[in-house]
Amino acid sequence: MKIVFLLWLLVASVWPVVAQPSSEFEAANKLFEQGRFADAAAAYERLLTNSPTAALHFNLGNARFKSGQPGKAIFHYHQALRLSPRDPDARGNLQFARRSLGVTVDEPLARHLLRLHTPDEWARLAGAGLGAWFLLLALGETLPAKRAAFAWLTKTFGVIAIVSASLLAAAHWERRTAGLAVVVVPEAAVRPGPLAESKAAFTLRDGTEAVVLDAKDDWLHVRDSGQRAGWVKRESVWRLP
């Protein structure tokens, strides 16, 4: 069961999804329904250590948002979308949380298309295309008289396999290089260098999403949507894996 708290519609209900294995999940949902959002968040966090699912991340994001922790909510909505990239509820709540902070994130079309599927889904699609291509090649060798009839299908599945494999590689590359971190403290000081003695150049508030450029010891080099860059303490942000 997943609590579908649609921030953008301001309603809350319970939808059936992939069943969670323990009554603790239902107990956490009950805490949320009772308005005990901090307690619900703690309960969802405990469950995440054993069975991280899109439903858990989604519900935890809702509990964090209602607890006044927009950064942690945004982090968990991202995690839900990593596991279930076409979930309209997680995407809708992520956009609502951003708008509540006065933030608009323009995602490049190529990145949006890559994230419509998980890397595992791209791998399955590539594998299916490759398998069908080899099967048609084998049939063409076994039945020479039918080779011409299979030609267009063979070419089609060959193209599907190549394109899917390319998208799989691109999806893995995008996840490795487009590192994202979310500020989870009320205000994070951004410094010109990875030194506590450096004077803060500017600050990032709770919920700000930033691209991770580099890392050194307890510091991350980040760039915000306004193209400002600097170093923040790791403890100030949660980095998406």
Task: Annotate each predicted stretch with a short phrase.
Residues 70, 153-185, 192-195, 199, ...:
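Boundary regions of SH3-family modules and the immediately adjacent low-complexity/disordered segments
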Residues 202-234:
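SH3/SH3-like beta-barrel superfamily modules
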Residues 103-144:
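Membrane-embedded alpha-helical segments of integral membrane proteins
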